[in-house]
């Protein structure tokens, strides 16, 4: 079956993408690793000893980045409804973190600690209908914010991918109510044509 023009364009862009080549060379599972690396270079969210949760972690490139930085004294917990191949130094839980059994398993692993950081690069399966996709995207963002509210220590940080649209301002307002400072980040590895940006909440109240 012949590929569509948009499919061919995506394939050509993928083949020519410097971040795809860098990911292959550096051993990362996806180009998204460089988004987190760039943000972390600027904001120093992940350090040796950091305890964090990676929501929507599959295929695992953000968990790879985090595990390499936190070292033996830190801890990375990864959660996703999809399976993920093991990442050294990462505790992975497969399941929906809204479900009681999944949360219970996570909290047992957490063992009474509070998180320094929650990161979320979650995105829904896109339907191609922008209104539906935006609603699904912000539902994931809201769930991630609730998770951060419940598990971050005072002073902890939250990094989340959002897509700009009608729900953006209310979501930004909700983040500002929970954090001392909220800033936007658009890393170079984020494609120019994408409406995605990252919101970073610093200093959980």
Swiss-Prot record:
InterPro entries: RNA_methyltr_RlmE, RNA_MeTrfase_FtsJ_dom, rRNA-MeTfrase_E, SAM-dependent_MTases_sf. Disulfide bonds: none annotated. GO terms for cellular component: cytoplasm. It is found in: Cytoplasm. Specifically methylates the uridine in position 2552 of 23S rRNA at the 2'-O position of the ribose in the fully assembled 50S ribosomal subunit. Keywords: Cytoplasm, Methyltransferase, rRNA processing, S-adenosyl-L-methionine, Transferase. The gene is rlmE. Belongs to the class I-like SAM-binding methyltransferase superfamily. RNA methyltransferase RlmE family. Its main location: cytoplasm. Its EC number is 2.1.1.166. Pfam families: FtsJ (PF01728). It is an enzyme of class 2 (transferase). GO terms for molecular function: rRNA (uridine-2'-O-)-methyltransferase activity. Coiled coil: none annotated. It catalyses: uridine(2552) in 23S rRNA + S-adenosyl-L-methionine = 2'-O-methyluridine(2552) in 23S rRNA + S-adenosyl-L-homocysteine + H(+). NCBIfam families: PRK11188.1 (NF008390). This is Ribosomal RNA large subunit methyltransferase E. S-adenosyl-L-methionine binds at residues 60, 62, 80, 96, 121. The active site is at 161 (proton acceptor). Gene3D superfamilies: Vaccinia Virus protein VP39. Transmembrane segments: none annotated.
